[in-house]
């Protein structure tokens, strides 16, 4: 029997005792509080994890998670912690059969550290891991895709239904999904999926709704894992091309939609 697919989740952690997420986490590494046992003092990571592998709402419930806590209780993090976490995932790729990585994180800051994040995700990609990054919620402006999602290699995901988004300080954003092109004139995002009012697991128990490209991204990560379950021989670029063939073109500019919309239910029917 093929070993269960491992998915690395870079986020705020996980409430692993949630009834939908029990026995899902095979490894937990904390770069914020340096604690050994899984926890989530924000909720973002638990919500993302539930979209991927939760029993009730997860797309790939048979997959297992390698959880990297790189964001604190306010959803803030440091580039150096991200880079350490990238290294951990590459070094433990075979141990946990890590075939995909979800990064519902982004920074709009440009500079050396942001470029290092891009280099880091590309190293993961080159090691055989399908890296899926959020386009960020800084739209609708051109060039608003966040790092490391600007990488031309990785799969970058925007939100199709991005009419409204409430940020963590209570500010309402409209048409928020990050748009390309990147500073290197790369068309981004690569795909869109549904990110508005997504129901998933809460770090307080039960369920809650969240919106943003952070919620659209794990849907694509989970679908990538399902593809790899069926086609374990595929390389990251093969998965990206598979998704390209499955995407539905919309009447939108390329720098808004990339290859088009991925509808999880429709794609899963064809895998």
Regions picked out by a protein language model, each given a short descriptive name:
Residues 1-27, 35-80, 96-99, 150-154, ...:
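Subtilisin-like serine protease catalytic core
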Residues 7-9, 27, 64-69, 97-104, ...:
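Structural recognition of the beta-strand scaffold that forms the well-ordered cores
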Residues 11, 19, 149-229, 233:
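Extracellular S/T/G-rich loop segment that most often corresponds to the catalytic His/Ser-adjacent loop
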Residues 12-15, 139, 266:
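Short, glycine/acidic-enriched loop or turn micro-motifs at the edges of active sites
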Residues 49-52, 66-72, 101, 191, ...:
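Hydrolase catalytic cores
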Residues 57, 87, 91-94, 126, ...:
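Generic secondary-structure signature for well-ordered alpha-helical cores
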Residues 71-153, 183-186, 201-211, 215-216, ...:
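Substrate-binding/access-modulating region of protease and related hydrolase catalytic domains
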Residues 260-269:
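Catalytic cores of secreted or luminal carbohydrate-active enzymes
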């Amino acid at each position: 029997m093929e070993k269960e697919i491992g998915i690395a989740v870079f986020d705020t952690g996980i409430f692993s005792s949630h009834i939908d997420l029990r026995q899902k986490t095979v490894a937990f590494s904390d770069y914020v509080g340096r604690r050994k046992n899984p926890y989530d003092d924000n909720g973002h990571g638990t919500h993302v994890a539930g979209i991927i592998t939760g029993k009730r709402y997860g797309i790939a419930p048979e997959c297992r998670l390698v959880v990297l806590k790189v964001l604190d209780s306010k959803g803030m993090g440091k580039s150096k912690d991200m880079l350490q976490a990238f290294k951990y995932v590459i070094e433990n790729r075979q141990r946990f059969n890590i075939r995909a990585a979800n990064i519902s994180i982004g920074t709009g800051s440009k500079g050396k550290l942001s470029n290092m994040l891009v280099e880091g995700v590309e190293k993961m990609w080159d090691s055989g891991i399908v890296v899926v990054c959020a386009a960020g919620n800084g739209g609708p402006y051109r060039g608003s895709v966040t790092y490391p999602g600007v990488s031309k290699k990785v799969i970058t995901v925007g939100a199709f239904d991005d009419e409204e988004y409430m940020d963590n300080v209570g500010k309402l954003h409209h048409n928020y999904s990050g748009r390309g092109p990147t500073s290197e004139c790369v068309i981004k995002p690569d795909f869109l999926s549904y990110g508005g009012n997504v129901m998933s697991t809460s770090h307080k128990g039960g369920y809650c709704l969240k919106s943003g490209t952070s919620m659209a991204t794990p849907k694509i990560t989970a679908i990538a894992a399902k593809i790899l379950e069926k086609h374990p021989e595929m390389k990251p670029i093969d998965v990206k091309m598979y998704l390209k063939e499955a995407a539905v073109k919309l009447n939108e500019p390329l720098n808004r939609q990339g290859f088009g919309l991925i509808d999880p239910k429709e794609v899963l029917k064809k895998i």
